[in-house]
Amino acid sequence: NKFNPTFTAETHNFPTGIAPFPGASTGTGGRIRDTISIGKGGSMVAGTAGYCVGKLFTNHYKKMDCHSPEHILLRASDGASDYGNKIGEPLIQGFARDFSTDYNDKHIEWLKPIMFSGGIGVMKNSNTKKDHAKNGMLIIRIGGPAYKIGIGGGSASSKNQSSSDYLSNIMAVQ
């Protein structure tokens, strides 16, 4: 069998800002799900994770009711690697950036972090196309009902975040 490389990527920015460990963990999990669900199934090879945060080593985050960049970097890194490690996907590289500047008498920095999860995988050439269900086949649905947590996450994460309302959309995170 010939193999095809697969490359997947996902961001989990808003959840990682609210709850760094589980936010990054579920970001990695969602990306791994995509890797193994492609076609008739793929296999994981390795992952990467990246983080962009506001200015490091400052105390002004305590006033804004949000996690410090240091806390996000440490806990998100733990979450991303924890998920992959538990199912056999190593993180082989990553990146981290901080950003803060003063421009035209305004302070600008990333309050909402960026959490990037990328993956490399392989898929057998014979698995690239899914089969159609045929009469008489048993079809099984796996999963449960949707819960109220996480509802509205896409719209909440797209809102401008300020220091006064950063955690106000906490129910939008799973």
Name these PLM-found stretches:
Residues 1-174:
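Glycine/proline-enriched, intrinsically flexible loops and inter-domain linkers
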